[in-house]
């Protein structure tokens, strides 16, 4: 029985090219590339850019669509997180994974965002 439990635990640990990653729970997402964890950590999704909700470059309709898509994927969900760095606003720049699904890549593949060329070297999939 102990071996079976260990096997199940091993299978359910998220793995990626980076090995086992820490788990966090997303409280909500402000927009298509910024989320907050239940611990209050602000996460800026690495390697992508999505439309802005506010400001000079605001494009509210696609921005809300990207935000809603992201919220449906990750809000109140356990996700794996690969922390990369901190940005100039103090947010953690990171990749999020739901199982084997790279959330950033999915947003780009579904048309909700684009690869952020300036930082694309931070993620294996966007190089």
Could you describe each region identified by the protein language model?
Residues 3-127:
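Small beta-barrel nucleic-acid-binding modules, primarily SNase/OB-fold domains
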């Amino acid at each position: 029985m102990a071996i079976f439990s260990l096997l199940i635990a091993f299978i359910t640990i998220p793995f990626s090219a980076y090995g086992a990653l820490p788990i966090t729970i997303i409280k909500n997402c402000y927009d298509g590339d910024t989320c907050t964890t239940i611990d209050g950590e602000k996460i800026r999704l690495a390697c992508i850019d999505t439309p802005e909700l506010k400001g000079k470059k605001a494009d509210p309709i696609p921005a809300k669509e990207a935000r809603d898509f992201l919220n449906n994927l990750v809000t109140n969900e356990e996700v794996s997180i690969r922390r990369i760095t901190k940005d100039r606003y103090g947010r953690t720049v990171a990749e999020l994974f739901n199982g084997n699904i790279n959330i950033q890549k999915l947003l780009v593949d579904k048309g909700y965002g684009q690869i952020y060329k300036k930082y694309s070297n931070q993620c294996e999939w966007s190089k």
